[in-house]
Amino acid sequence: MFDSKVAIVTGAAQGIGQAYAQALAREGASVVVADINADGAAAVAKQIVADGGTAIHVPVDVSDEDSAKAMVDRAVGAFGGIDYLVNNAAIYGGMKLDLLLTVPLDYYKKFMSVNHDGVLVCTRAVYKHMAKRGGGAIVNQSSTAAWLYSNFYGLAKVGVNGLTQQLARELGGMKIRINAIAPGPIDTEATRTVTPAELVKNMVQTIPLSRMGTPEDLVGMCLFLLSDSASWITGQIFNVDGGQIIRS
């Protein structure tokens, strides 16, 4: 599906990002496994290569313009260009996050610089290289928290949705599409570490399909949105959530 294509996946050292990176490699893409956790990214890239795929790892702080540019330069140097970007990097605080009125502002600013601003920073770093290749596609990681929760994790994802829609308007003329996936509760190490078990149980009870999702449940949507099958889709947010959010 993605032979001769190059994809950058941020936050790819574990969990959802790892699943995206491995799936893209299985479909023939050359993958840049990018993460602030350099050792984790290296391990994922090594496994992709062991499985017969093509990958390199790059350390990146998505909130830092110079770091994002270095990531892109490394990708272009290794593979000659960039076709796809998956903005998956995030700080995840689970449901124990403070409300806006009580969160320490220093932490709030750091949190937003990664979960919200990082989407824009990486998109700005990559889009000209996509345009040089005649276009490309970007998938942003949102969350159903944008509609459900009153803390700043949800607020960051509201912002990601807004960025997705505005950037679709700005990038469309360059034949670059951008969409977002909004997962419901996903069973990852991050979720298990920071979300109280009772809250997880309560969330599952609100999901018509009666279970948490897995990273693999999101892979199909990501691959579709990057592929030519989605060539007339941009600026959209797609819930992949077991029915957690059902809207008319």
Swiss-Prot record:
* Superkingdom classification of source: Bacteria
Question: Which Pfam families does the UniProt record give?
Answer: adh_short_C2 (PF13561)
Q: What name does the UniProt record give this protein?
A: Uncharacterized oxidoreductase Rv0769
Similarity field:
Belongs to the short-chain dehydrogenases/reductases (SDR) family.
Q: Where does NADP(+) bind?
A: 8-32
Q: Which residues form the active site?
A: Y153 (proton acceptor)
PANTHER family in the record: 3-OXOACYL-[ACYL-CARRIER-PROTEIN] REDUCTASE, CHLOROPLASTIC, SHORT-CHAIN DEHYDROGENASES/REDUCTASES FAMILY MEMBER
State where substrate binds: S143
